[in-house]
C-alpha cells in the first residue's frame, strides 16, 4: 500500500508538479492537497494520522508554512513535514526557522518550470520522502518495543528525556 502524502502549497503549478512527481512512484501517493496553510492545518487536525509525510511551502496566504509548523509544535501534533521552500539560499532564515519548528528537512523550490522537471529535483523529493518515512517507521517500531511512545517523535533527532541522563530519539 502506498504511503499517503499531503501537499500544501499556494501555487497551483507547484501542487501539480509535486503531485505528478510523487504519483510516479508506487511507494507514495498524494491523497490530499491544500492551497494554503489554514486549509492544510484543518486537514492535518481532522486526520492526524492519515499522512506519512507532508510537503509544505513556506510563503503562503492565510497561514504561512512557519506559522503552520509552530501550530503543530504548540499543539503537539506529530507529523513528518518536508519543506519545499521558495527561498533561494539553503541557509536562509526561513529555512532555519522551519527546521527549528520541527520540519524534517527542506528542498529549495526550482526557479522555473523546466527545473521542476529535472532529475535532480525529483531525486531530492524522493530521497527526502524515503528518509523521512523510513525514519518515522523505525522510531514507531522502537517505541512499540520499549513502551516509550510518548518519548518518540517523528523527526528522529536526539533529545534527552527529563527523567533520564541517556539520549533518546525525539525532537
Can you describe what each PLM-predicted range is?
Residues 1-171:
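Strand-loop microenvironment adjacent to phosphate/nucleotide-handling motifs in alpha/beta enzyme folds
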Amino acid at each position: 500500500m502506498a504511503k499517503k502524502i499531503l501537499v500544501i502549497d499556494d501555487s497551483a503549478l507547484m501542487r501539480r508538479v509535486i503531485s505528478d512527481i510523487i504519483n510516479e512512484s508506487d511507494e507514495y501517493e498524494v491523497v490530499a492537497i491544500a492551497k494554503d496553510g489554514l486549509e492544510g492545518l484543518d486537514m492535518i487536525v481532522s486526520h492526524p494520522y492519515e499522512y506519512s509525510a507532508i510537503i509544505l511551502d513556506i510563503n503562503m496566504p492565510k497561514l504561512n508554512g512557519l506559522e503552520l509548523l509552530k501550530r503543530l509544535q504548540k499543539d503537539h501534533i506529530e507529523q513528518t513535514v518536508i519543506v519545499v521552500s521558495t527561498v533561494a539560499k539553503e541557509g536562509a532564515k526561513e529555512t532555519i526557522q522551519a527546521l527549528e519548528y520541527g520540519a524534517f528537512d527542506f528542498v529549495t523550490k526550482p526557479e522555473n518550470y523546466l527545473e521542476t522537471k529535472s532529475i535532480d529535483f525529483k531525486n531530492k523529493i524522493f530521497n527526502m520522502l524515503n528518509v523521512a518515512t523510513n525514519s518515522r517507521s523505525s522510531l514507531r517500531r522502537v517505541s512499540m518495543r520499549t513502551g516509550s511512545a510518548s518519548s518518540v517523535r517523528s523527526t528522529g533527532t536526539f533529545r534527552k528525556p527529563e527523567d533520564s541522563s541517556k539520549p533518546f530519539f525525539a525532537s
